[in-house]
């Protein structure tokens, strides 16, 4: 029974990890509909789409296992971003995603331990966490490339 509860904890943390992220806030508040760099906006849309996919998949497992879906809320501090250019936020988004990647690695360790106790039923959870880590690594690469491109554009267009 404890391993089943541990699986619920891992899945709930995974959902909150993505759902309460600054990237998800940007998506849900439509901040990226404002004027700004289109390539950066498209990259952010792709990243958030992947994150939403992980949330959906984790929630599907939670429902199938008859677990409660976690509640999540955005920090009030995020509302201060409404008048800020996305390029200005990019370093903050990268730093936040790096922290979330470390949290995912801890979740992976917990999920692996559950698989040992519970078997294949928890294997889906462990695999989902592994996929999320791999995706986040790719997302960080994409965001760092965008950051580098934007810095190069500033230096080449400066007088």
Residue ranges and their predicted role:
Residues 1-9:
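Extreme N-terminal tail/first-helix region
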Residues 38-73, 143-150:
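Conserved alpha-helical segments that form or flank metal/cofactor-binding pockets of metalloenzymes
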Residues 10-17, 21-28, 78-137:
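Acidic/histidine-rich alpha-helical segments that form the ligand environment
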Residues 58, 125-159:
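Short, contiguous alpha-helical
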Residues 1, 30-35, 77-81:
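A short small-residue
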